[in-house]
Amino acid sequence: MRIIAGEWRGRPIQAPSGQGTRPTSDRTRETLFSMLVSRIGSFEGLRVADLYAGSGALGLEALSRGAAHVTFVENDPRALAAIRSNIAALKAADRTEVRPSSAATLSPTQPFDMVFADPPYAQGSGDAVVAAVGQAGWLAAGGWLAIETEAKEPVEPGDWTVDAERRVGRARLTLIRA
């Protein structure tokens, strides 16, 4: 795995060991960021959250492209170690926060401009993300929620709007606008 574009383009990303995570492939990440850039233009100055962060690849990609700050939420110890290792390798500690907790039970915080979520593939996981993000107030008005689910699983946007969906291999990428 590697960073696709921006300040750290081509830099490797360490993936967590074991079967507990399913890292987003370079191809899927490239498709997702292409979809986002065509809509938002730039990540400059954005506050970003990376839920079910795994290796932190989505949040690190956003940082590489100019995001001001990324909060990583993950509860798997091996994934947390990989995230911290990747942050250290990129010398990005001053622009990040790592929250060792479950993304399924988010505590209220200042809203983010962009929220990435890559929950485990399971029936209803995308809908659960929409509900948790909405209840905790994690998405700013006009912000974006990007969710990766299994290809056969559509995501209901709740009070928000689905802006785009795309299938990439076994994955479905859903962009939701607040």
Protein language model features and the residues they cover:
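Class I S-adenosyl-L-methionine-dependent methyltransferase catalytic core
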Residues: 1-178
